[in-house]
C-alpha cells in the first residue's frame, strides 16, 4: 500500500486586543492583522494551498484566518468550529482526524496552550533541525508550524508527524 504525504499547518491566532465584552469576542490588533497577513504570504510562497481550513469560531481566530488567507492568496472557505475554541490537545487531535482523506493540506487556526501542545506532541523528532529549535523557543501569536504527515488523517497520532518548517508572522 502506497503512503500519501499530507501537509498539516498549525497556527496560533495573531495578536489580539487585550479585552472585549467576552474573551470570545476579542479582535485582532492592527499588528495582529499584519502579522497574519505576512504569515499567509510566507505560506503562499511555499506553495501551500489548503483543502480544508479548520478555525476556532472566536473573533481573533476568524480575523487571523481572513488575514492569513488574504496574504496567501487563498480562496478557501474556512470551517469555523466552536469546539476548537476551548479544546484540549486530545479533542483538537480528534478534530484533525475527522479530515476527509481527499484533503492534502489542512490548516488549523486555534489558541494556546492547545496549538503549542499539539504541535509539540505531533513532532516525531526527525524534522528540520532549525524548525525544531525555533519551535522549542515558544509558540507566540502568529506562530505557524508545518508538518509532513504520512498516511491517513484518521491515523494521526502523537509523534506521528515530521516538522518541516516553523515561522512566526511579522508584518
Roles of regions detected by a PLM:
Residues 123-162, 168:
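Domain-level recognition of soluble alpha/beta enzyme cores
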Residues 93-99:
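Short, surface-exposed amphipathic charged segments that create phosphate/polyanion-binding patches used
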Residues 8, 105-107, 144:
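Residue-level preference for the first positions of well-ordered beta-strands
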Residues 15, 58-60, 113, 151, ...:
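Short, glycine/serine-rich, charged loops/turns that create anion-binding
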Residues 104-123:
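A glycine-rich beta-strand to alpha-helix segment
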Residues 2-91, 123-129, 139:
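Active-site-proximal alpha-helix that buttresses catalytic centers in soluble enzyme cores
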Residues 46-48, 99-104:
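Glycine-rich phosphate-binding loop signature in dinucleotide/nucleotide-binding domains
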Amino acid at each position: 500500500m502506497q503512503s500519501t504525504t499530507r501537509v498539516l499547518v498549525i497556527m496560533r491566532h495573531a495578536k489580539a486586543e487585550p479585552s472585549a465584552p467576552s474573551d470570545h469576542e476579542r479582535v485582532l490588533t492592527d499588528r495582529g492583522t499584519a502579522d497574519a497577513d505576512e504569515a499567509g504570504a510566507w505560506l503562499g510562497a511555499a506553495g501551500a494551498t489548503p483543502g480544508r481550513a479548520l478555525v476556532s469560531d472566536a473573533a481573533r481566530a476568524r480575523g487571523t484566518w481572513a488575514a492569513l488567507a488574504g496574504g496567501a492568496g487563498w480562496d478557501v472557505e474556512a470551517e469555523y468550529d466552536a469546539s476548537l475554541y476551548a479544546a484540549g490537545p486530545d479533542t483538537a487531535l480528534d478534530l484533525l482526524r475527522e479530515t476527509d482523506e481527499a484533503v492534502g493540506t489542512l490548516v488549523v487556526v486555534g489558541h494556546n496552550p492547545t496549538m503549542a501542545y499539539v504541535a509539540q506532541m505531533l513532532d516525531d523528532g526527525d524534522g528540520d533541525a532549525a524548525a525544531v529549535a525555533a519551535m522549542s523557543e515558544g509558540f507566540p501569536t502568529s506562530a505557524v508550524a508545518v508538518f509532513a504527515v504520512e498516511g491517513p488523517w484518521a491515523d494521526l497520532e502523537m509523534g506521528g508527524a515530521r516538522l518541516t518548517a516553523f515561522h512566526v508572522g511579522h508584518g
